From Swiss-Prot:
GO-annotated biological processes: cilium assembly; Kupffer's vesicle development; lipoprotein transport; nervous system development
Gene: unc119b
Biological role stated in the UniProt entry: Myristoyl-binding protein that acts as a cargo adapter: specifically binds the myristoyl moiety of a subset of N-terminally myristoylated proteins and is required for their localization. Plays a key role in localization of proteins to the primary cilium membrane.
MF annotations from Gene Ontology: lipid binding
Official protein name in the record: Protein unc-119 homolog B
Organism: Danio rerio (Zebrafish)
C-alpha cells in the first residue's frame, strides 16, 4: 500500500508461473510446486468509473473497468453463482518475506460440505465466504515485502486467463492496486501460489491515521476468467493490534 497517485498504482513486473520461464518456483514440503507471482507493472490510467456505472452496464465486467474505480465498492459487483468454475479458496497465509514470520494463516476444514440449511443461509447472506476482517499490529505498515500464499481448487471446467485485481483504499482514497495473473488451471486441480506484495514506504502521517481509524482501510479483490468478472471478495483492516 502507498499514497501514490493512480498513475503509479501498481507494483512490479508480471511473473506468470504457468506461462513464463522467468516465474519463481519453489518445491512445497508436501510435494508439488509453489508459484510466486508478482504484480503487473506499467498500468496506464483508466477512465474513472463509478460503481453505479458498472452496475448499469448489464453485461460482464472487465478488468479495465474495475481499474477505473476510484473508491471501494459498497456492495459486490457479481453474484456467488457467477463462479461457474467452482473456484474454491481453501488456505491462505500471509508472511513477512524478509524474516519468514507468518503473520496470518487460515485454512478451510477438509470435507467442509454445507447441508441444505447452510445453503439457504448462504443464499440469504451475500457476503458469506467473501469477506475477511484482519487485525495487524502497527508494525505491519512498516513492512516492505509481504507474501500471500493461496491454495485453491477448481471444478470440472478448465480455467483460462485467471487473473486477480486487488485495490486497497483508506477512507476512499486509493492506496495501491495489485494485478496478478494465475494463468491456466486444469480441471479438478488443486493449485498453490504466493502473491508478492511490494510496499513502498508510507508517510508517517498516513500511518498514524490508518492506526487511529481501524477498519477504514478496505480492499476489493476482483477475480476474472477470460476477462469476465466471476468473483468479488472484500476485506477491511485494522493496524492497532496489541495496543
Amino acid at each position: 500500500m502507498n499514497s501514490q497517485s493512480s498513475r503509479n498504482e501498481t507494483a512490479a513486473t508480471a511473473v506468470n508461473g504457468s506461462d513464463s520461464a522467468a516465474a519463481s518456483r519453489d518445491h512445497k514440503s508436501g510435494g508439488g510446486v509453489l508459484k510466486r507471482l508478482k504484480s503487473r507493472r506499467n498500468q496506464v490510467d483508466r477512465r474513472p468509473v463509478t460503481e453505479e456505472e458498472l452496475r448499469a452496464l448489464g453485461r460482464d465486467i472487465t478488468p479495465d473497468e474495475v481499474l477505473g474505480l476510484r473508491a471501494v465498492a459498497r456492495d459486490y459487483l457479481c453474484k456467488l453463482e457467477d463462479n461457474i468454475y467452482n473456484i474454491d479458496f481453501t488456505r491462505f497465509k500471509i508472511r513477512d518475506l524478509e524474516t519468514g514470520t507468518v503473520l496470518f494463516e487460515i485454512a478451510k476444514p477438509p470435507h467442509c460440505d454445507l447441508d441444505e440449511e447452510d445453503d439457504e443461509n448462504r443464499d440469504a447472506d451475500t457476503s458469506a465466504g467473501r469477506f475477511v476482517r484482519y487485525q495487524f499490529t502497527p508494525a505491519f505498515l512498516k513492512l516492505r515485502t509481504v507474501g500471500a500464499t493461496v491454495e485453491f481448487t477448481v471444478g470440472d471446467q478448465p480455467v483460462t486467463n485467471f487473473r486477480m485485481i486487488e485495490r486497497h483504499y483508506f477512507q476512499d482514497r486509493l492506496l495501491k492496486s495489485f494485478d496478478f495473473d494465475f494463468g491456466f488451471c486444469i480441471p479438478n486441480s488443486r493449485n498453490t501460489c504466493e502473491h508478492i506484495y511490494e510496499f513502498p514506504q508510507l508517510p508517517e502521517d498516513l500511518i498514524r491515521l490508518m492506526i487511529e481509524h481501524p477498519y477504514e482501510t478496505r480492499s476489493d479483490s476482483f477475480y476474472f476468467v477470460d476477462n469476465k468478472l466471476i468473483m468479488h471478495n472484500k476485506a477491511d483492516y485494522a493496524y492497532n493490534g496489541g495496543q
